[in-house]
């Protein structure tokens, strides 16, 4: 029985986390994409101070061996390990606390109202942190927004010049 993409990502996450933790790294995201006979498995990692090329190479070697033994991916694939980049996604409550004070972009599933009464799906502003399960932001237009986590489709850091 073929596994669904989300199931593969969940199994990879479960398999990879002990290795990642032992290397004092943080797993940001697992991405699996298949196109025809080709597939790509991407793991995005981070650590305080940023990841190095050696971190990525070391983890790639460790995981390659483990993935070959476990045989979770039903076809040939390429394994890519990298940093999440300057526009790092925010996935966990800890991310919202860690990156408090940074400029972020948030997209909601449906239009949501900011504190000035404007309804929209995209918010750009300074992350103030979490309060009662909501992401609190000072928006670039001067308003504020408090967006419940369950309404957020995507959130990411924004590069500042």
Curated annotation (Swiss-Prot):
One of its GO terms (biological process) is ribosomal small subunit assembly. It is found in: Cytoplasm. Pfam families: DUF150_C, RimP_N. Signal peptide: none annotated. Gene3D superfamilies: Ribosome maturation factor RimP, C-terminal domain, RimP-like superfamily, N-terminal. Keywords: Cytoplasm, Ribosome biogenesis. GO terms for cellular component: cytosol. Belongs to the RimP family. PANTHER family: RIBOSOME MATURATION FACTOR RIMP (PTHR33867:SF1). Required for maturation of 30S ribosomal subunits. This is Ribosome maturation factor RimP. It comes from Pelobacter propionicus (strain DSM 2379 / NBRC 103807 / OttBd1).
